[in-house]
Amino acid sequence: TRISHRIFATSRSEMGSNMNYKIYLDYTMDILSHLKISCHIIDSPFIWNEQYDGGLRKTIWNDAAHRSQMNDFNRFVSTYSKDNTILIIHDSFCCEYIYLKLPDSDKIFIAGPFSFEKFTNQRITELCTYNSIPARFNEFMQLYYAALPVFTDERCIESIINTLCSK
């Protein structure tokens, strides 16, 4: 699995005492949804669901490859499931995901996909080649990237998430 990540430790360890963060989490999810970033609260252990990436992987991979990749991703995320830690996950499709284990809980917040780069036709072709995506999926990939929220300034998303974690 080709995944990179950055880890941000939250600035205040009291974020989750007695679920006081719920109002801030709801507010953050509302902001992100207005930015067209899908958000989910799920129970751990983390198990990939095709809705998290808009069906991208399920569409382009056969069932065996899809299962294998999802198992690898689940193991990766479970390794970093720690309180007071935010993961910004960058996958091989140049999609970003925000992952945060909610404190005092077995629940996980995940948001994405979105990107920090604009996608040209050439860039999409490069990503398809890099990920060994058959040519028959070119139109699907063009539509997928056209619909993906793009933020050319990473500080926008990082500020939203860091503000959540400071509460």
Q: What are the residue ranges of the model-derived segments?
A:
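Hydrophobic, helix-rich cores of sensory/ligand-binding and other regulatory modules
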Residues: 11-38, 42-45, 63-167
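Amphipathic coiled-coil signal-relay and dimerization helices
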Residues: 47-61
